[in-house]
Amino acid sequence: MRFILLLSLPLYALDQLTKRFVLQLISLYEARVIVPDFFSLVNVPNTGAAFGSFRGNNTFFIVISVIAFAVVMFLLIRHRPPDTLRDVSLGLLLAGILGNLTDRLLYGHVVDFLLFNLHVRYADPWPAFNVADSCISIAVVFFIIHSFRKQKSAG
């Protein structure tokens, strides 16, 4: 559990500090180009889910986040053998859930600020996201890898 907190808390702090920086220095919907035609910092409110889908459902996503937080905490305090990949996944997920939940409670929306132009058809630019979103996405990838490893070792 201590290991997970040592991972989660700095990532949560990084998420909140970067969002505070954006809110103080970048006006709503403004873009600050960092690398021309590739990367900008923006200030985009998101009341929906990933990629801005299901907009206008902040209360619903607060409830979902609280439930997800409770499930992750249950999984963390349950006695089970150590598993590094699973524990890293849970730590990343915890940081991401808390980061976006904090935004929803404080601001009424999630603060998205990283905008990449990957020159990919139908995603040009890629939708804005934040550190918490990155933590959640990486956690999902790690969970998938973990489940395949478990299936392979069982079979």
For the regions a language model picked out, list residue spans one by one:
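Alpha-helical transmembrane bundles and membrane-interface segments of multipass inner-membrane proteins
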Residues: 1-155
